[in-house]
């Protein structure tokens, strides 16, 4: 895809989704946390490499989110107290729809308190 984005010369946006697990150490989460940290690093590197082509690269790292997997792993957790997938989707929509230059290459952490 990046090959075609470069050729378009119209300026594009890439948004990658990582996780707070990639920036917060947790025992027993080595593989998952490492893969999410790699997404953050990849996004930052791509932002540098693609800037000359007017391609903006963002990364978001959601915290706890009410998904089917989360319900399975933490069945006693109150799902209403954590982020809903729709909330993450709204943030993604806002990031992609705005012409925000100062966020290029940033990892944006989103959490529900």
Regions found by a protein language model. Give the residues of each.
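Alpha-helical segment proximal to the catalytic Tyr-Lys
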Residues: 3, 47-49
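Hydrophobic structural elements of the Rossmann-like NAD(P)H-binding subdomain
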Residues: 15, 57-60, 70
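Residue(s) in the substrate-gating loop at a strand-loop-helix junction
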Residues: 19
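Active-site loop immediately N-terminal to the catalytic Tyr-X3-Lys motif
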Residues: 24-30
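Catalytic tyrosine of NAD(P)H-dependent dehydrogenase/reductases that use a Tyr as the general acid/base
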Residues: 32, 40
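Active-site helix of classical SDR
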Residues: 35
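C-terminal helical subdomain
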Residues: 59-60, 67, 76-113
């Amino acid at each position: 895809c990046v090959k075609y984005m470069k050729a378009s010369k119209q300026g594009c946006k890439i948004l990658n989704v990582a996780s707070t697990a990639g920036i917060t150490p947790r025992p027993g989460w080595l593989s998952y946390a490492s893969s999410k940290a790699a997404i953050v690093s990849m996004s930052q590197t791509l932002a540098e490499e693609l800037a000359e082509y007017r391609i903006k690269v963002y990364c978001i790292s959601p915290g706890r989110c009410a998904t089917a997997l989360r319900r399975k792993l933490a069945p006693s957790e109150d799902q209403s107290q954590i982020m809903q997938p729709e909330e993450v989707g709204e943030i993604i929509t806002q990031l992609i729809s705005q012409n925000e230059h100062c966020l290029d290459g940033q990892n944006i952490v989103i959490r529900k308190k």
